[in-house]
Amino acid sequence: VYSNSGEGLHRFVDPADDEVYLYTQFETGDARRMYACFDQPDQKATFKISTIVPAHWEVISNYGVDATKDLDGDKKFIQFAESQVIATYVTAIVAGAYQSVHDEYQCDKTIPLGIYARKSFFKYVDAENIFEVTKQGFAYFEETFGLAYPFGKYDQIAVAEYNWGAMENVGCVTFHEDVLIFRSKVTERSYISRATTIHHEMAHMWFGDLVTMKWWQDLWLNESFAEWASYM
């Protein structure tokens, strides 16, 4: 089931502490590597994801946790809330010994916010700036689009060995570690670039995730809209 190519369900072992980390990357047609589905952008469905993982792991998916249960063998069962109707390519599971920090955005509803990184990288997370940029994006897009954030929570996860800059999984946005986390002093341009990427992926929640093209030949609509919106 695991891959080492960054497609489907990718497995990474951190050389710093031997902790194991998993993440999914399904765009364009790799959800079928992990579960049986009609893996097309127009064939949307509701999803109710559950996992069994080591007891010390964190698991992040598109929606919040609905139920948990401790199991024998130092494992645990996690059931996530059922999703809205979404495309297969924006479903996601991220799991491992992640550390996290949390906040919330207040609008007509409360949106839980999370930032996750592997244990050996977490000390570099600039949560204050990332949360500030995230909240600014929500405020601007909700007002500009005239539509409240259409999903539940909003987590942003830095993952290792990532082929992309970032991916707009519903409520579970994955980023290349070097895009989201700065391990040394950087220029103002780097902060602007990170903010642009955060807002690009956030714009996809409305255009790409909520409203989705019928087939991959029109993926440029998703990307051009998100790129335009990220500079607004």
Language-model regions: role of each:
Residues 2-5, 61-63, 231-232:
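Short, intrinsically disordered, charge-balanced linker/junction segments flanking boundaries
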Residues 223-232:
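Acidic/His/Gly-enriched intrinsically disordered linker/tail segments
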